Each structure stands twice: as C-alpha cells, then as structure tokens.
From Swiss-Prot:
Keywords: Cell membrane, Cell projection, Cytoplasm, Cytoskeleton, Hydrolase, Magnesium, Membrane, Metal-binding, Pyridoxal phosphate. This is Chronophin. The gene is Pdxp. It catalyses: pyridoxal 5'-phosphate + H2O = pyridoxal + phosphate; pyridoxine 5'-phosphate + H2O = pyridoxine + phosphate; pyridoxamine + phosphate = pyridoxamine 5'-phosphate + H2O; O-phospho-L-seryl-[protein] + H2O = L-seryl-[protein] + phosphate. It is a peripheral membrane protein. Its EC number is 3.1.3.16, 3.1.3.74. PANTHER family: 4-NITROPHENYLPHOSPHATASE-RELATED, CHRONOPHIN. GO terms for molecular function: growth factor binding; heat shock protein binding; magnesium ion binding; phosphoprotein phosphatase activity; protein homodimerization activity; protein serine/threonine phosphatase activity; pyridoxal phosphatase activity. It comes from Rattus norvegicus (Rat). Disulfide bonds: none annotated.
Length: 309
C-alpha cells in the first residue's frame, strides 16, 4: 500500500537498484515552461550511466514527436531518441490507426479539435484529416486535443459528426487545466472534452494518463516489466493514478502541480490510488541513489518509427 514516504537514503538506493527503468512526466517534472528543473539533465545522464532506461510520458498534445524531441534538445536534454517520447498525440494517432472504423480502402477522416502539432502527428501516422485537400471522405472519428481556438462553431461541427453512432469520439487526455508560470491557469483538454461529451451525449475514449492505453503503447515498442518501473510525476490525479493502474512504483516530485499536503489528504481519506509510494522535493534528489549501480540489460530497440501497422 502506498504511504507517501520520502524517498532517500537506503530506501532510495534499493528502489533504484531494483528498477529496470524510469518513466518521467515532462511538464512540472523536467521543466516548468522554459525553465528546466535544476539537476534534471544531469539526472538523466546519470541514469543512463547506471544502465537505467528512461522513457517520457506527456499528456501535452500540442507538439508532434519530432518537435517534442527538439524541445528536449533545446532545453539541454541530450542523447534522447524520439522513439522514447510518448505524448498523448502519439498515442491518439496509434489508437486511431488501430480502431478507425470503415473499410481499409476508405478508412474515412478524423475531425480534429487541436493544434498543428497534433495534426502533424496524425498525418505522420498515415491518417486523413477532415479539411485536408482532395476528396472529402466521411468523418469517422472526432479527436479532442488541446485547442487554443476552441469555439462554438467547432463544438457544433463535432456534435454533427457524432450523431453517427459509428463515429468514434477520442480525447487525448482529461487534464482539466494547466498551470501558467504567473500562477494562473489555462483550460486543459479535459475541459474541452467535457463540453463535447455533454453536447453530444457521447463518452470519449481517452488515450493519455491516467489511461493504461499510454502504457500499452510503450509495451508495444519496449520490453518493460511494470513491477520494475518507476513512474515519476507531479500530478496525483494523472501521473500517480496512471502509475498505480499500470502496476508501477510511483514517485511524486514537488516541483509541479500537486503538493505533499494533497497527497497526505488522499492518504487520510483512503484514496490510495492517488497516493504515491514515495515523494521527493525534486527529481535531482534521485541522484543520491545512483552511486555504484552496475548497468543491467537495456531495452531492445523500438519498433521502426514507433508505429505498428
């Protein structure tokens, strides 16, 4: 049972020593806006030197995978492969490839509520989007992502497509809001998805955390044992719940959204799926447990391109 204990000393060395690898959330864990969390790039280098594989899971659907990889590099995180980055955009593209209804020779199009990064990820997966040049195929899925230009007109069009019972409704995530560096908030995809669900009377399939589908995408590309993986995140209702649902050891870092007091309140209320096994002030605190670790076997190379037909 998770007890929200501080991870340090012998416990830290034992947890890292037994771990196959680490899944990191990004926003609030590795960086906040354009400011990296002090020590984060060095930690990833130390984990690599110790033979611990690192993968990255983000509900941010605004960037296509190549663009997200460039962001890592620009902020000083070097030596990463794009195939190690799993965003809700990547997972949405995969789910739609797998589940889009319709005959193979006319799979239909996706109506997207989202930005150009999400659209680019879908096109890279071979999906057709409503409004693209060429024939106007039947819309067979509505995808709700982070859309800074969400409008009544877009909501109306989405609901019109969803009157077809065979049209899928997919959401990248349910994050209701996101913190801004000035302390204010901006609506998240979860708020937009709730509007579409309410107006259409449909329930969305969600691909991002805490949905286990994101971990399924990882296991399709990498040989991972969830019992030997750490999930490190800053949001209890997203990252920590995701870790518990997938059978991982969970670590809350206090550099982002959730506080230690919130975790302790969930513990007192018996909501154990929202309570981390451990917490750290910052992921830089994990470096203390890496001394003297010998490299275990690495993950095999991922499937070509990260997509499966």
């Amino acid at each position: 049972m998770a007890r929200c204990e501080r991870l340090r000393g012998a416990a830290l060395r034992d947890v890292l020593g037994q771990a196959q690898g680490v899944l990191f959330d990004c926003d609030g864990v590795l960086w906040n806006g354009e400011r990296i969390v002090p020590g984060a790039p060095e930690l990833l280098q130390r984990l690599a030197q110790a033979g611990k594989a690192t993968l990255f899971v983000s509900n941010n659907s605004r960037r296509a995978r190549p663009e997200l990889a460039l962001r890592f590099a620009r902020l000083g995180f070097t030596g990463l492969r794009a195939e190690e980055l799993f965003s809700s955009a990547v997972c949405a593209a995969r789910l739609l490839r797998q589940r889009l209804p319709g005959p193979p020779d006319a799979p239909g199009a996706v109506f997207v509520l989202g930005g150009e990064g999400l659209r680019a990820e879908l096109r890279a997966a071979g999906l057709r989007l409503a409004g693209d040049p060429g024939d106007d195929p039947r819309v067979r899925a509505v995808l709700v992502g982070y859309d800074e230009h969400f409008s009544f007109a877009k909501l109306t069009e989405a609901c019109a497509h969803l009157r077809d019972p065979d049209c899928l409704l997919v959401a990248t995530d349910r994050d209701p809001w996101h913190p801004l560096t000035d302390g204010s908030r901006t609506p998240g995809t979860g708020s937009l998805a709730a509007a579409v669900e309410t107006a259409s009377g449909r329930q969305a399939l969600v691909v991002g955390k805490p949905s286990p589908y994101m971990f399924q995408c990882i296991t399709e590309d990498f040989s991972v044992d969830p019992a030997r993986m750490l999930m490190v995140g800053d949001r209890l209702e997203t990252d920590i719940l995701f870790g518990h649902r997938c059978g991982m050891t969970t670590v809350l870092t206090l550099t982002g959204v959730s506080s230690l007091e919130e975790a302790q309140a969930y513990l007192a209320a018996g909501q154990h799926d929202l309570v981390p096994h451990y917490y750290v002030e910052s992921i830089a605190d994990l470096m203390e447990g890496l001394g003297g670790l010998s490299p275990p076997p690495q993950f095999p190379d991922p499937v070509d391109g990260g997509y499966r037909p």
